[in-house]
Amino acid sequence: MAKQEVKKIVLAYSGGLDTSIILKWLKNEYGCEVITFSADLGQGDELAPIREKAFATGADKVYIDDLKEEFVRDFVYPMFRANAIYEGHYLLGTSIARPLIAKRQMEIAKIEGADAVSHGATGKGNDQVRFELGYYHFNPAITVIAPWRDWKLNSRQALVNYAKKNDIPIPVTKKRPWSSDRNLLHISFEGAILEDTWAEAPENMYVLTKAPEKAPNKPQYVEIEFKNGNAVAVDGEKMSPAQLLAHLNFIGGEHGIGRVDLLENRSVGMKSRGVYETPGGTILREAHMAVEQITMDREVMHLRDSLVPRYAEMVYNGYWFSPEREMLQALIDESQKTVNGVARVKLYKGHCRTVGRKSETDSLFNLDFATFEKDQVYNQKDAEGFIKLNSLRLRIRSLQAAAKKK
């Protein structure tokens, strides 16, 4: 669609430097109605001034939608039922938020009769892919405006200059020069000192977690109950998904849980450093795997585990709405029907580890079989035949090798 044909744009708006400048740029370049949409995914105080700021920067209409429960229930929980983790460290806090933002943005575009949507993701990053795959899933004909791929403001200083010229407040300061992205699952940090891969992230960067060495000297035990693979209660208290994750974030943050410093492989091909705080998610994943240990069949678990890296890549690369992710989700959800029980985890100075697990309804742990004491149900002599059959191919190979030496 030609620029002059665009009559109304819905912008995914965070209120940060990039999207504030994009809002003004869209008004200046397209001269049309621009509606901002901000998703409340648990950013906290960041959203407080966003309506006033959007109108002050030129927005014609402002949407601020509370999506916290939908975010955790329909996006975070399905992903955690899969134990998804990218490259062994990243719990996908940013990746899993983008599909929901894209979904709601496209709903607003339909309600408002907008012919274009826009986002603030750069042309170097993963988010441009995640947003736009979501857009096209809901409307294959939508016009997408990605300013970072179009404009000449190709540096942070150029953005600052544009902001000053157009009287846009600049939230980035010399004290906190890095960029951040926050939701109920995590907060991420990129840029500035983190572009030096040898430099340690400064302590004043962290928001959700205490430094482990400054965490309480006494450990805390937390019990998390699961039903069909979803966390439903903490220490016996039933909570909604968003309430539960927020509660675990607070507890985990007090004990320095969930800090990750990662050099990850972006979907566009380059490596990028990110520092993440995911206190509640770290506890949740540990507890979920503990309940699986006592309730999930061995072969089901091993098959599911073999698919986790692929599932995580789908989420990371923006394929949440893809048929392959939905197919894997159906398989994973089937495996979770027996994941009912309670895990007890111990939090202490940055560490979260399981110290107990139980299931009243679906435990596959049978003490009569597993005990090291005398039992009446397991004949240890039976193991001999099992071992001989399982070693047959190894014995044949050894005999063949010996014959070749003669």
Swiss-Prot record:
CDD domains in UniProt: ASS
What are the subcellular locations of this protein?
Cytoplasm
Q: Which domain of life is it from?
A: Bacteria
At which positions is L-aspartate bound?
A: 122, 126-127
InterPro entries in the cross-refs: Arginosuc_syn_C, Arginosuc_syn_N, Arginosuc_synth, Arginosuc_synth_CS, Arginosuc_synth_type_1_subfam, AS_cat/multimer_dom_body, Rossmann-like_a/b/a_fold
Pathway annotation from the record = Amino-acid biosynthesis; L-arginine biosynthesis; L-arginine from L-ornithine and carbamoyl phosphate: step 2/3
Q: Name one GO cellular component term.
A: cytoplasm
The reaction(s) catalysed by this protein are: L-citrulline + L-aspartate + ATP = 2-(N(omega)-L-arginino)succinate + AMP + diphosphate + H(+)
Keywords assigned by UniProt, alphabetized: Amino-acid biosynthesis, Arginine biosynthesis, ATP-binding, Cytoplasm, Ligase, Nucleotide-binding
Q: Give one GO molecular function term.
A: argininosuccinate synthase activity
The residues that the entry says bind ATP are: 12-20, 39, 120
What is the predominant subcellular site recorded for this chain?
Answer: cytoplasm
E.C. code: 6.3.4.5
Pfam families per the record? Answer: Arginosuc_syn_C, Arginosuc_synth
- GO biological process per UniProt: argininosuccinate metabolic process; L-arginine biosynthetic process; urea cycle
Q: Which HAMAP family match?
A: Arg_succ_synth_type1 (MF_00005)
| Quaternary structure and partners | Homotetramer.
Write out the similarity annotation: Belongs to the argininosuccinate synthase family. Type 1 subfamily.
What protein name does the entry list?
Answer: Argininosuccinate synthase
UniProt source species = Geotalea daltonii (strain DSM 22248 / JCM 15807 / FRC-32)
The coding gene here is: argG
